[in-house]
């Protein structure tokens, strides 16, 4: 396979590749472009910009926006939903780090 085709195929598998326009992203989420702008303004996701300045979203960003949409649909204000998701992500990171430290301590604890 030629190099340029390999690169294009790699982009299809990349969760961070900005493949979705604002309109398409809104359709996928069942949301409005205004909702996407709101989660962007709240700092939850930062879409990339095309050369023409249009917002482009990745699959990872759409998953995050979908979680915000779930919270908003349950009655949570957009800003609060974004904060909740940020805190959930921070908690996941802290728990993961805690597990790694405990694993290292368990491995080295037997040596001391």
What are these regions (language model features)?
Residues 23-25, 30:
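Compositionally biased, low-hydrophobicity segments enriched in charged and small polar residues
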Residues 32-35:
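Short coil turns linking two alpha-helices in DNA-binding domains
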Residues 22-23, 37:
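Residues within the helices of the helix-turn-helix
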């Amino acid at each position: 396979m030629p190099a340029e085709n390999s690169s294009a195929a790699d982009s299809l598998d990349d969760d961070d590749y900005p493949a979705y326009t604002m309109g398409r992203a809104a359709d996928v989420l069942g949301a409005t472009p205004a909702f996407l702008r709101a989660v962007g303004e709240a700092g939850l996701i930062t879409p990339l910009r095309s050369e023409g300045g249009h917002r482009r979203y990745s699959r990872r960003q759409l998953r995050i926006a979908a979680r915000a949409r779930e919270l908003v649909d349950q009655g949570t204000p957009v800003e609060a939903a974004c904060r909740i998701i940020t805190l959930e992500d921070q908690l996941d990171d802290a728990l993961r780090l805690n597990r790694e430290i405990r694993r290292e301590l368990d491995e080295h604890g037997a040596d001391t």
